[in-house]
């Protein structure tokens, strides 16, 4: 076969064609949502550049119903005059020419952001449609683009007193796949971040689809950012260290505070763009921090008195810091700007941090004492951990040559083809060992709940047998000097626990361990959660496995509706087999059951059920109407209730809203309880949903409709009772087994349902928002009780998967 390679093979992609051909080079991943959201941030960064130049105070980001998004600012507005070189408007040049903009002449913007330095032209190229509005010179200019090409010239469509730019774009869903919807959490995180970094700039985010909005406006700047990041932590000093200064044309702004935790959280920004991999600003900060703290400790006699040596890790334990620099023409290691390599930044950071930190330590003796105490304790613990590690090595516990005895290893030696199951308990571990494929599946049983590493110090973690066994089995070591993810022995680590509360707890403890000490395993996509079935269903000698409670409920519903019809005694035409109407009503009823559970503290269940069979309560201004409504309600309630309870109807006058509100009193022996239908409940989402289903049921009752299956009829009048009876009768000859533990399955079942690559289901653990994840682990797994209590109080009623 002849293979020629000549000049004809060299393709020149002109204009924005290169962007469309290789979008990932310019905007990031187009499948996982990264690139989609970077489109928004590219436009927002232009508005922030206007703010940095002193011309913009307000930015509005709106997610529209049609999945388009708009960004509007009150800056100067994109220039509209004709560009000398291109012969078209400057606005059109910016929208259609790569690397065209005001940031390249060093006069319009002294410093600027922009994640990839390609700006809004790339956003235009990757949009199905884009609308440009410019408010400038008391005129409104408008232009529309389709797939990156202008459909009209920039024209005046009106007049205005405001200035600024508005860009609305519709992403091209042929380019952006998988994740195609804008995510509130991702957008709000970045916009909140920008509001802290640029104090006194208001950034308003509005989601028209979900009807939620938030205004990000921070006057406190980086100090307020530190307070936000340390919200669920316990700071050891109240005064936040902060300075803003300039050296060698590098503007440096730093804020930091130590807390009682053990994690180091340092966030680096250059011209508002985050650097996940740090760079010269981070290395300059770290070296200055270590040197300054050592100088202070030596000068004050702490080192001699305590006979210690302080290293960088000691000074950064429990430290939350923000490093924000602004520099003209920064240099990065790659197009994505994840690491700063500008050499002049390091010396500027070292000099300024040394100067201002030493001043802070000398002027705040009590704060300094708390910080020094923390650093000395960290040094002692580090040395104790080193001695403990050396001791365990001598005993062979952490010797990576010898694997733990509990591990049943696989034959495969290629990590990419190997997987390890972390199994809850020896019993399930035994079944898993028999079920596995020995060629590439290893089994490590874990006894009981492992240590909560969020609360424990490093040396305590190393003393935990289950943790050290796990570390040894994985083979990648632990700790800053010994941890090497390249030595990981398995590229699939599968957590397999029981489907009960204890199993969830063990799974959470393991996730905490991996997130805090081996985050690269998560970032590389090596961590999974097995999905063993919760139910085994046997029907007509056929067995099927059902993964969870929701799937089981759907299975019960579909089984109950087999050969089921709706009939009417008065209207013979109403006869629908496996009908959509009944499915829809039952689905609504399931939602109502969830609502009943959430508001059961406000009303007893029998009152909530009775609401389904009464007309909507409205016209609260009419006392006679309200009185009749509540009296009819109580009469029906009393008929269906036991004789031990006495119900009475009352109304109360709400003087504030000038309305009448019905009230039910329930008396049992000497105890009397009151339940009021107040205006807040009547206007609530919950009551509207109850009424919506109730209206449908009442219409069916009026038409004498009933449910019929296998010559049995079920009345609509007591829907809850008869629906449950329908399901009960449908499952008379069906055997349902609920697995509480993995040990209840024999090896064959475990292989078939959970371990066979051909049939198993697994959840892959991914990491998107580091700040949110940090806070979640700190809140739920940390040693502060109050934030956890507030979290539970806030979200308890939203919980649906509760194991009772």
UniProtKB/Swiss-Prot annotation:
Entry-linked Pfam families: DNA_gyraseB, DNA_gyraseB_C, GyrB_hook, GyrB_insert, HATPase_c, Toprim
Q: Which residues form the Toprim domain?
A: 418-533
Positions bearing the site annotation: Interaction with DNA: 449, 452
Binding annotation for Mg(2+) 1: 424, 498
Q: Which PROSITE patterns match?
A: TOPOISOMERASE_II, TOPRIM
| Primary site of residence | cytoplasm
Record-listed Mg(2+) 2 binding positions: 498, 500
EC number annotated for this UniProt entry? 5.6.2.2
**What's in the keyword line of the UniProt record?**
ATP-binding, Cytoplasm, DNA-binding, Isomerase, Magnesium, Metal-binding, Nucleotide-binding, Topoisomerase
One GO cellular component from the entry?
chromosome
Q: Which PANTHER family match?
A: DNA GYRASE SUBUNIT B, MITOCHONDRIAL, DNA GYRASE/TOPOISOMERASE SUBUNIT B
Assigned protein family: Belongs to the type II topoisomerase GyrB family.
Its recorded name reads: DNA gyrase subunit B
């Amino acid at each position: 076969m002849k293979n020629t390679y000549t000049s004809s093979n060299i393709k020149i992609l002109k204009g924005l064609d290169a962007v469309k051909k290789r979008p990932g080079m310019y905007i990031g991943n187009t499948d996982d949502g990264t690139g989609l959201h970077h489109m928004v941030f590219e436009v927002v960064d232009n508005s922030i550049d206007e703010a940095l130049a002193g011309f913009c105070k307000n930015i509005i980001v709106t997610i529209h119903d049609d999945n388009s998004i708009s960004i509007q600012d009150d800056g100067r507005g994109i220039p509209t005059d004709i560009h000398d070189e291109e012969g078209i408007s400057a606005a059109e040049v910016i929208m259609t020419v790569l690397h065209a903009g005001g940031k390249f002449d060093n006069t319009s913007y002294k410093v600027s952001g922009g994640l990839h330095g390609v700006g809004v032209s790339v956003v235009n190229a990757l949009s199905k449609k884009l609308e440009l509005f410019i408010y400038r010179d008391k005129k409104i200019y408008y232009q529309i683009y389709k797939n990156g090409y202008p459909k009209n010239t920039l024209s005046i469509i009106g007049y205005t007193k405001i200035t600024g730019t508005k860009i609305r774009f519709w992403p091209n869903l042929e380019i952006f796949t998988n994740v195609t919807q804008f995510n509130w959490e991702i957008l709000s995180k970045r916009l909140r971040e920008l509001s802290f970094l640029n104090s006194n700039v208001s950034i308003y985010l509005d989601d028209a689809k979900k009807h939620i909005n938030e205004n990000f406006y921070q006057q406190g700047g980086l100090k307020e950012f530190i307070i936000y990041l340390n919200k669920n932590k316990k700071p050891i000093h109240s005064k936040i260290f902060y300075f803003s200064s300039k050296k060698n044309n590098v503007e440096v702004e730093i804020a930091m505070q130590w807390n009682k935790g053990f994690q180091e959280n340092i966030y680096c920004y250059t011209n508002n763009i985050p650097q996940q991999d740090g760079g010269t600003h981070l290395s300059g900060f770290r070296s200055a921090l270590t040197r300054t703290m050592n100088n202070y400790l030596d000068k004050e006699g702490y080192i001699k008195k305590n006979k210690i040596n302080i290293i960088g890790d000691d000074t950064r334990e429990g430290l939350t810091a923000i490093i924000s620099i602004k520099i003209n023409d920064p240099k990065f290691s790659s197009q994505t700007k994840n690491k700063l390599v500008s050499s002049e930044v390091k010396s500027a950071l070292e000099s300024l941090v040394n100067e201002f930190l030493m001043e802070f330590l000398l002027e705040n003796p009590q704060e300094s004492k708390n910080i020094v105490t923390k650093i000395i304790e960290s040094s002692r613990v580090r040395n104790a951990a080193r001695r403990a590690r050396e001791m365990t090595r001598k005993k062979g516990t952490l010797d990576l040559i010898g694997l733990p005895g509990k591990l049943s290893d696989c034959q495969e030696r290629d990590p990419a083809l190997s997987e390890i199951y972390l199994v809850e308990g020896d019993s399930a571990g035994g079944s898993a060992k028999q079920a596995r494929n020995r060629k590439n599946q290893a089994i490590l049983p874990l006894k009981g709940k492992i240590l909560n590493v969020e609360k424990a110090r490093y040396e305590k973690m190393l003393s935990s047998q289950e943790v050290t066994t796990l570390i040894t089995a994985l083979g990648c070591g632990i700790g800053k000097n010994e941890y090497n993810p390249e030595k990981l022995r398995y590229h699939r680590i599968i957590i397999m626990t029981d489907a009960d509360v204890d199993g969830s707890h063990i799974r959470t403890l393991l996730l905490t361990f991996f997130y805090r000490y081996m985050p690269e395993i998560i970032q590389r996509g090596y961590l999974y959660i097995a999905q063993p079935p919760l139910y085994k269903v046997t029907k007509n000698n056929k067995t099927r496995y059902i993964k969870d409670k929701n799937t089981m409920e759907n299975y019960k519903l579909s089984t109950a509706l087999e050969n089921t019809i709706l009939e009417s005694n008065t209207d013979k035409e109403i006869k629908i087999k496996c009908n959509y109407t009944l499915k829809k009503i039952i689905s609504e009823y399931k939602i109502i059951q969830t609502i009943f559970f959430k508001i059961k503290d406000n009303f007893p269940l029998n009152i909530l059920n009775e609401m389904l069979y009464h007309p909507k309560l409205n016209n609260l201004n009419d006392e006679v109407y309200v009185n009749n409504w509540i009296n009819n309600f109580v009469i029906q309630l009393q008929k269906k209730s036991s004789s031990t309870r006495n119900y009475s109807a009352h109304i109360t006058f709400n003087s504030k809203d000038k309305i009448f509100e019905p009230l039910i009193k329930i008396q049992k022996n000497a105890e009397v309880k009151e339940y009021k239908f107040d205006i807040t409940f009547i206007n609530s989402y919950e009551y509207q949903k109850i009424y919506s289903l109730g209206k449908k049921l009442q219409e069916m009752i009026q038409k004498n409709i009933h449910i019929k299956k296998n010559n049995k009829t079920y009345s609509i009048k007591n829907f809850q009772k008869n629906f449950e009876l329908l399901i009960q009768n449908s499952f008379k000859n069906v055997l349902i087994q609920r697995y509480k533990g993995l040990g209840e399955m024999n090896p064959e079942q475990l292989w078939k349902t959970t371990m066979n690559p051909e049939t198993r289901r697994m959840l892959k653990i991914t990491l998107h928002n580091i700040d949110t994840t940090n806070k979640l682990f700190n809140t739920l797994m940390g040693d502060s009780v109050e934030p956890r209590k507030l979290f539970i109080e806030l979200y308890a009623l939203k919980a649906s998967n509760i194991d009772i």
